Amino acid sequence: MVRPLNCIVAVSQNMGIGKNGDLPWPLLRNEFKYFQRMTTTSSVEGKQNLVIMGRKTWFSIPEKNRPLKDRINIVLSRELKEPPQGAHFLAKSLDDALKLIEQPELASKVDMVWVVGGSSVYQEAMNQPGHLRLFVTRIMQEFESDTFFPEIDLEKYKLLPEYPGVLSEIQEEKGIKYKFEVYEKKD
């Protein structure tokens, strides 16, 4: 069974997603809660969601928050020989991680699969065949960044007018406006 893949990301107007291993903007508490709710909430009793992230994204999470709780954490790295402390699994690539998820020990435990960064992992996910959703928080301001989100090809991805559990009106925190968007691609 090929399950849909979900990417979740917050991007500034200049498509920035990171700066010096952190977010380019101040912590937006409600945006962070949205990330937690979306990636944690499982629709299937007894199953957990799974998050996939690159090594740099893993180490950008404060140690006290690793692993992301109530979720199965897979870290991608071609260099590491074993999962970093706290991570549940290590895979060499997104393809390897997706194969791992379909192994019997995990297949029965996993509900939704979320890619949570960084750039190259998002790029790899967006190039996957099949059903893909992008949950994009548009931060409606430019922030200096050194890490960016790949271009969303609107020939392939459709912006959905609404999505269950996702607010459609513009949000504001700390003087920063943002909005939640959901894109979908079906091959």
UniProtKB/Swiss-Prot annotation:
EC id? 1.5.1.3
Q: Name one GO biological process term.
A: regulation of removal of superoxide radicals
GO-annotated molecular function? dihydrofolate reductase activity; dihydrofolic acid binding; folic acid binding; mRNA binding; mRNA regulatory element binding translation repressor activity; NADP binding; NADPH binding; sequence-specific mRNA binding
Species: Rattus norvegicus (Rat)
Tell me yes or no: is Acetylation among this UniProt entry's keywords: yes
Reactions mediated catalytically: (6S)-5,6,7,8-tetrahydrofolate + NADP(+) = 7,8-dihydrofolate + NADPH + H(+)
Annotated substrate binding sites? 31-36, 71
> What name does this protein carry?
Dihydrofolate reductase
Q: Which Gene3D superfamilies match?
A: Dihydrofolate Reductase, subunit A
* DHFR domain span: 4-185
Subunit structure of this chain's protein: Homodimer.
Which residues get modified to N6-acetyllysine?
33
Q: Where does NADP(+) bind?
A: 10, 16-22, 55-57, 77-79, 117-124
Q: Which family does it belong to?
A: Belongs to the dihydrofolate reductase family.
InterPro entries membership = DHFR (IPR012259), DHFR-like_dom_sf (IPR024072), DHFR_CS (IPR017925), DHFR_dom (IPR001796)
